[in-house]
Curated annotation (Swiss-Prot):
Gene name linked to the record: nhaA
Localization of this protein: Cell inner membrane
Transmembrane regions: 14-34, 59-79, 95-115, 125-145, 154-174, 179-199, 213-233, 254-274, 292-312, 328-348, 363-383
Superkingdom: Bacteria
Protein name: Na(+)/H(+) antiporter NhaA
Family stated for the protein in its record: Belongs to the NhaA Na(+)/H(+) (TC 2.A.33) antiporter family.
Length: 394
């Protein structure tokens, strides 16, 4: 396993543990005497005014639209690297996790629609259980230390990256509301400039980020979700230049600690604080949260494992070396941890609707993700080999 992937896995695992702490603090604050402090923090007004440009939003939306764009920038960099040189480079490496990820998105969405397909409003949340939170999943996996084979970690990483790419496409196609053609036109010009810079071999990361900032503002104003700007910029930054530098790798290396230890935990803190006041058992067991929880806990492993098994049996893909189907099933349960990505989609799906929909959707996400984490961890403990003693070389 390359040093890049090894470092990535370490940071994601540690970041996942911080995510858990941030979410727990948010839940405690939202259901204690500190609820007012918590809400006031999220409602802090933040404005940027440059000439005729005026962007005014509460802190919560700056986190969701701004900081999450940085997260998606890193996702774009990761996906490009893995497609060109990493665990997804070449057909043989990419097919197995790609098919698994496809099943892991389709089955949860279909199960959700079985619960909520008849309701025009809640139907909009069909993509909520389709997401996997890679940081959380790797954080749980890290609890088992060196018992986890390297190939299994890389499989989870590749599957989650493809899953992220699928979620990005879903956001672009299904969660875009009113569109400003003027802003989209300027955004298209910015994308064309980024593509030209890439073609000409421009290696200055700052130049891409400056154009990317313009792109972010244009996409934000266009009505398309602004986080997509991050993905586009990530794909446009060169992986290598003529002088053998890697602007993409350098930026990813610099961003990763900020994303793992600050941006995602801050997003979790800002969005996981669900007030349980007024929440009833009948509401918690209603179709919306049950559809999400069932989609995550049942749909994810059903889709990932079934599609993986069929791909191998039909000769479409090969099972990675030193991995068996018991381990694949355990990891597929772990992929039911949707958390940050699912909460992000829920905020888009039910934006401007009854606040109760967002509340119960988050509760469904927490229920499904927690169950998947506990059961997935327990299954991994059963199917993985015994602890391997570390060998010190002197």
């Amino acid at each position: 396993m390359t040093n890049i992937i090894r470092q990535f896995l370490r940071q994601e695992a540690a970041g996942g543990l911080i995510l858990i702490i941030a979410a727990a603090i948010a839940l405690l604050m939202a259901n204690s005497a500190l609820q007012g402090v918590y809400q006031s923090f999220l409602d802090i007004p933040v404005s940027i005014k440059i000439a005729s440009l005026d962007i005014s939003k509460p802190l919560l939306l700056w986190i969701n639209d701004g900081l999450m764009a940085v997260f998606f920038l890193m996702i774009g960099l990761e996906v490009k690297r893995e497609l060109m040189e990493g665990s997804l480079a070449g057909r043989d490496k990419a097919v197995f996790p790609a098919i698994a990820a496809l099943g892991g998105m389709l089955a949860p969405a279909l199960i959700y629609l079985l619960f909520n397909g008849a309701d025009e409003v809640t139907r909009q949340g069909w993509a909520i259980p389709a997401a996997t939170d890679i940081a959380f999943a790797l954080g749980v996996m890290a609890l088992l230390g060196n018992r986890v084979p390297t190939g299994l970690k890389v499989f989870l990483l590749a599957l989650a990256i493809i899953d992220d790419l699928g979620v990005i496409i879903i956001i672009a196609l299904f969660y875009t509301q009113q569109v400003s053609l003027q802003s989209l036109g300027i955004a298209a010009a910015a994308i064309a400039l980024l593509a030209y810079m890439n073609w000409r071999g421009v290696g200055k990361t700052s130049a891409y980020l400056l154009v990317g900032l313009v792109l972010w503002v244009c996409i934000l104003k266009s009505g398309v979700h602004a986080t997509l700007a991050g993905v586009i910029v990530g794909f446009m930054i060169p992986l290598h230049t003529q002088d053998q530098r890697s602007p993409s790798e350098s930026l990813e290396h610099g961003l990763h600690p900020w994303v793992a230890y600050l941006i995602l935990p801050l997003f979790a803190f800002a969005n996981a604080g669900v007030s349980l006041q007024g929440v009833s058992l009948s509401g918690l067991t209603s179709l919306l949260p049950m559809g999400i929880a069932t989609g995550l806990f049942i749909g994810k492993p059903l889709g990932i494992f079934t599609f993986s098994w069929l791909a191998v049996k039909l000769g479409i893909a090969k099972l990675p070396d030193a991995i068996n189907f018991k381990q694949i099933f355990a990891v597929s349960v772990l992929c039911g941890i949707g958390f940050t990505m699912s909460i992000f989609i829920a905020s888009l799906a039910f934006e401007g609707t009854d606040i109760a929909l967002t509340t119960y959707s988050k509760l469904g996400i927490l229920l499904g993700s927690t169950t998947a984490a506990v059961v997935g961890y327990s299954l991994l403990r059963l199917v993985l080999p015994a602890w391997r003693k570390a060998v010190n070389v002197r």
